[in-house]
């Protein structure tokens, strides 16, 4: 954005990016009131028109992506996610989900691996293009934390159909 001295009409606030150099998108990954499906759709459609090419669904309020990550989404929520993924694809936007496998790094044994693989199958069925494993906002008091998180990311990458796998570590700044 450029500093402007005169009011600018809203339609001129979004500059058209060069798709050759920038991969713009939105990460819906914040605390607070989540968007409604209508708000989410309107935002995605508007930003698709401005050259944004991915949408990562990861609201902190979606308990089935955080503390209750092992549980599948209820049918109504899963249907809404599926419709949104289809709409993203129809608008040329890659669809992704940010999963925060709460406390899974503490015991990444057979049971947890099976739960993660099962969850990834459910998410893949939505037409997942992007998968993000989000370890931010979690405890990080283990000397093996980075090793476990890397192990989980590798496992997820091997068990998803998503073409891109991203991660956000517990510590991503100088101070924990």
Which residue stretches match the model-derived regions?
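N-terminal carbohydrate-binding accessory modules
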Residues: 1-23, 38
């Amino acid at each position: 954005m450029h500093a402007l001295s005169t009011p600018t009409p809203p339609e001129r606030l979004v500059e058209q990016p060069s798709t050759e150099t920038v991969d713009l998108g939105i990460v819906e990954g914040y605390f607070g009131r989540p968007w409604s499906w209508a708000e989410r759709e309107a935002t995605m459609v508007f930003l698709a028109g401005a050259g944004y090419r991915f949408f990562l669904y990861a609201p902190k309020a979606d308990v089935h992506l955080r503390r209750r990550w092992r549980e599948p989404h209820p049918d109504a929520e899963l249907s809404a996610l599926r419709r949104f993924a289809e709409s993203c694809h129809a608008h040329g936007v890659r669809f992704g989900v940010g999963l925060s496998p709460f406390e899974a790094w503490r015991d990444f044994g057979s049971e947890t691996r099976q739960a993660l693989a099962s969850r990834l199958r459910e998410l893949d069925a939505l037409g997942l293009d992007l998968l993000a494993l989000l370890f931010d906002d979690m405890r990080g008091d283990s000397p093996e934390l980075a090793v476990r998180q890397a192990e989980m990311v590798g496992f997820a990458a091997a068990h998803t159909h998503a073409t891109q796998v991203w991660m956000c570590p517990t510590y991503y700044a100088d101070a924990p």
